[in-house]
Structure formats: C-alpha cells, structure tokens
Amino acid sequence: MITILGPTACGKTRLAVSLAYRLGTEIISADSRQIYRGMDIGTGKDLADYQVGGTTIPCHLIDIRPAGDKYNLFAYQHDFHQAYASILARGMDPILCGGTGMYIEAVLKGYHLPDVPPNPTLRDRLQGKSLTELTLILAAYGPLHNKTDVDSAQRAIRAIEIAEYIKNNPAESTEFPPIDSLIIGLDLDRDTRRKRITDRLHARMHEGMIEEVKGLLDSGIPADDLIYYGLEYKFVTLYLTGQTDYESMFTGLETAIHQFAKRQMTWFRGMERRGFLIHWIDALLPADEQCEAVMKLYTANG
C-alpha cells in the first residue's frame, strides 16, 4: 500500500489520483469529514478531482454516512479493512490518502479500539469546561488519541470519553494486523500553506459554503450536530444562527483552519517519532515530478 498524507491544502488528492491512474488502482480516503453525504464544499470533496484521462478513479469511504451522523475511529477501522481487502482481492495495491492522522496511524499500526459507549457521568463532569481546558485534559491521556480534529467542546468531550474508556478497558492490538506501507508526506512551507488556506476559504465562500450549511440546517440537522463537525460547519452554523457576524465568522474560521493545519503537521511529526518512516516530497513540485518521485520509491520498495 501507498499512503499519501499531509496538511490541508497541500495537494494530496491530486497526487493520489495521479498515482492511482498510473498504477491502475483505487484510493481509500482517510478524511474524518468526507465520509458524510451533503458535506461537500466544506470538506473539499470535489469528485471532479478523481477524473483523469477520461477515467474515474474509485475512491472508497467518501459519502458513506448521512450528514448529522456520528462516526468514529472504531467504525473507520472496520470500513477501511473492508475496502482494503476488496482492493487486494482484485490484485491491486491500494492508495490511502488523507489528513486525519489518527485514522492513518490506527490502520497502519493495527490498533484495536473498542466501540465506546456513552458515559453520562463523565459527560456531566466535563460540561461547562472550555475547549482549552478540555484539550489539556485530553492531552494527558497520551499520543494515541486524536487531537487534530478536536475543535469544539462536544468533540473534545467525546474524545475524552473514548480515552477514558480505553484507559480502563485496555485491549491488545490483535484484531487488525499492522500494514506495511510506503508513506509519502507532502511538505509545504508555512507561508505558502497559509496563503493556500486563505485563498481556498475565499473560494469556498464564493462556491456556496454558506448555502451548503443552510441547506443542511433546513434539512433538519440540529445546529449542535453541525458545530460538532468543526471548522467550516461550526463557524458558518454560528453565523447562520445569529451567534456571530460575517466578518468575525470568516476571520475566526481562517484562524481555526491555520491552527488545524499546524496540528496536522504536529501529528505527522509525532508519527515519525513513533517509528513511522515518512518520505517527504516538496508539495510545490510539478505534479508529474511528484508522481515520478513516488514511483521511484514504490519501485525500490518492491
């Protein structure tokens, strides 16, 4: 398997699609929000990106759950392994592509995580704490727990709930075997990354980001559920429900996405410290040069 990872706005999908076309294979998404149907603009889910040379590259684990649903790492592991086994059975090496580091690390390491039930007592104890306080509590549980996507109090409380359950119910990593993968990271300097994020945010607003969120609210999805998803869905929902003005929404969202990208890179650097070999490629290289660099590594790795 080939794994393509990197921060938001670095061009992961473009590289993965080019490689999949070249190798005649399929992609498995590692994005915690692209799984939801109807959440398209805010997650960067442009299905046209998967068209190359007149061919549509199959991408698994996109649009598999309704918006408003709750999805977790336990479910992702099972869904990933179904897609992974299906692709292998058809004689292809899958390409895993995404920016949710916890999903990537869990499937590569073969972590076994249980389906964690709600803990009302713990939730009551955590209610009323700020996101900063909750993030500090979560950090005390160690590196395994995903802090990358925790940008609302609701998500932080759920992450702590999972971490607390695992601490009290330790499980051996036996259900899923580790996966040997060539890991490619797309590296983007900070200034370029920030500019891309800002430019992309302006573009998403022009493409109908606010209308997308309004449509989700009008379909009956509670505002709190959209806030749970964070980033665009959180900030635009706050704007549409009258809790902030447009300018504050935009600047707050822009800052949050910059912070999110920084947390992604922190996670990937942490993966290296935990023993993963990541081959970093300059994200500013032309697409064909990126593809050639990966192909050389892929061939060398057998």
From Swiss-Prot:
Substrate binds at residues 8-13. Keywords: ATP-binding, Magnesium, Nucleotide-binding, Transferase, tRNA processing. It comes from Porphyromonas gingivalis (strain ATCC 33277 / DSM 20709 / CIP 103683 / JCM 12257 / NCTC 11834 / 2561). Its EC number is 2.5.1.75. It is an enzyme of class 2 (transferase). Residues 31-34, 154-158 are annotated as: Interaction with substrate tRNA. Disulfide bonds: none annotated. The keyword Nucleotide-binding applies. The keyword ATP-binding applies. This is tRNA dimethylallyltransferase 1. It catalyses: adenosine(37) in tRNA + dimethylallyl diphosphate = N(6)-dimethylallyladenosine(37) in tRNA + diphosphate. Catalyzes the transfer of a dimethylallyl group onto the adenine at position 37 in tRNAs that read codons beginning with uridine, leading to the formation of N6-(dimethylallyl)adenosine (i(6)A). One of its GO terms (molecular function) is ATP binding. HAMAP family: IPP_trans. InterPro entries: Dimethylallyltransferase, IPT, P-loop_NTPase. Pfam families: IPPT (PF01715). Its cofactor is Mg(2+). The record marks 100 as: Interaction with substrate tRNA. It comes from the Bacteria. Monomer. Gene3D superfamilies: P-loop containing nucleotide triphosphate hydrolases. One of its GO terms (biological process) is tRNA modification. Belongs to the IPP transferase family. ATP binds at residues 6-13.
